Amino acid sequence: MTRVKRGNVARKRRKKVLKLAKGFRGSHSKLFRTANQQVMKALRNAYRDRRKRKRDFRRLWITRINAAARVHGISYSKLTGQLKKANIELNRKMLAQLAILDPQAFAKVVETANAAQ
């Protein structure tokens, strides 16, 4: 069996991890073992939070639409039901943007939805 020297492979692997750990504080960016643990934790959190971000924004949009709808005397759930009946296909993001940036247009949407009832 011939001898296999793996120094270059190990160095490359460690350098890759330390490069990912750049910006971490203290030994978390200097020592391989702690840096490796922190990089794995950071990647795990990033993966989880990319999915969580979608849920968080949906909750935010619903809260904003509900607040704006209640100003016009209607709840969020009633508004969404009436929008479906009126065949108005605005998604939650669009409705939330309208509620904040153009309240008159949002009022028109609510009025149209109420008329279709």
From Swiss-Prot:
SUPFAM superfamilies: Ribosomal protein L20. This is Large ribosomal subunit protein bL20. The gene is rplT. Belongs to the bacterial ribosomal protein bL20 family. Coiled coil: none annotated. Signal peptide: none annotated. One of its GO terms (cellular component) is ribosome. GO terms for molecular function: rRNA binding; structural constituent of ribosome. Binds directly to 23S ribosomal RNA and is necessary for the in vitro assembly process of the 50S ribosomal subunit. It is not involved in the protein synthesizing functions of that subunit. Pfam families: Ribosomal_L20. NCBIfam families: rplT_bact (TIGR01032). Keywords: Ribonucleoprotein, Ribosomal protein, RNA-binding, rRNA-binding. One of its GO terms (biological process) is ribosomal large subunit assembly.
